[in-house]
């Protein structure tokens, strides 16, 4: 049964990847037209495609709360690469990712064409990075970051680093805390976390072979940034996530 499940889910996923490559190539061609602004089109297609990707992943998804209507800096705990499509299907989001993801076969190219902003960890140029992030927020775009800086097994919450929170202060927007919890058979899901020496294909294979798990996404009360510094903003966002998860 596990083998059949893997084959059927893999076939569906490969079809989606082929569709995504076609959509990304089309957007790339549109980008080359003089004066073309493909950002709205890219965001619509990205959200549409991510919703289909989520449907192909072996998760039952439950969402609590409402997505904000105003542009905000979304901050979430980070368990797996699957966090990105799950959140990206809820609202038009600009993603922030480590530079290494750009080198991933197919997935890196798709991420780039979806408008992902890549940063090199440890580059030391945090001011320039925050300027790039604030520019996205000033343009009315939601931005998603994972302030823990790495993935966890979902059973704990690491410190939220305030370095990238400065973009919300500079743009004068609120922070949208998000709590993501993966469960299987009533306990934390051991298959969902993408941690340690995991590689994308091996992790995906484990997910596709297994039974369906569940994901609970909580869109928590937004945190106004006015009057706060980045450390306090990070502390409040982390506290909101901890209370929701544990």
Predicted segments — roles?
Residues 106-109, 122, 155-232, 236:
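A cross-family acyltransferase "interaction/gating" segment
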Residues 71-73, 140-146, 216:
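Residue-level preference for the first positions of well-ordered beta-strands
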Residues 98, 119, 146, 178-180:
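Generic beta-sheet signal
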Residues 20, 24-34, 38-40, 55-56, ...:
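Catalytic core of membrane glycerolipid acyltransferases/transacylases, capturing the structured
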Residues 116-137, 142:
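A membrane-cytosol interface segment of integral membrane proteins
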Residues 1-60:
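N-terminal membrane-anchoring alpha-helices
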Residues 136-165:
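Catalytic-site beta-strand/loop segments enriched in glycine and acidic/polar residues
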């Amino acid at each position: 049964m596990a083998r059949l499940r893997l084959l059927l889910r893999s076939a569906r996923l490969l079809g989606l990847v082929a569709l995504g490559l076609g959509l990304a190539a089309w957007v790339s061609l549109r980008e080359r037209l003089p004066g073309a602004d493909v950002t709205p089109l890219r965001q619509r297609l990205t959200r549409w495609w991510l919703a289909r990707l989520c449907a192909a992943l072996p998760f039952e998804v439950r969402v609590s709360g409402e997505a904000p209507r105003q542009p905000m800096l979304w901050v979430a705990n980070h368990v797996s690469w699957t966090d990105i499509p799950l959140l990206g299907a809820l609202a038009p989001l600009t993603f922030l990712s480590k530079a290494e993801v750009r080198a991933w076969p197919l997935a890196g190219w798709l991420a780039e064409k979806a408008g992902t902003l890549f940063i090199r960890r440890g580059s030391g140029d945090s001011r320039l990075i925050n300027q790039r992030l604030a520019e996205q927020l000033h343009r009315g775009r939601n931005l998603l970051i994972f302030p823990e800086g790495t993935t966890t097994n979902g059973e704990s919450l690491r410190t939220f680093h305030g370095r990238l929170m400065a973009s919300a202060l500079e743009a004068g927007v609120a922070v949208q805390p998000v709590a993501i919890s993966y469960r299987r058979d009533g306990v934390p899901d051991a298959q969902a976390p993408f941690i340690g020496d995991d590689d994308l294909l091996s992790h995906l294979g484990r997910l596709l072979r297994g039974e369906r798990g569940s994901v609970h996404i909580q869109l928590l009360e937004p945190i106004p940034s006015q009057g706060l510094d980045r450390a306090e903003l990070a502390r409040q966002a982390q506290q909101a996530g901890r209370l929701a998860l544990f």
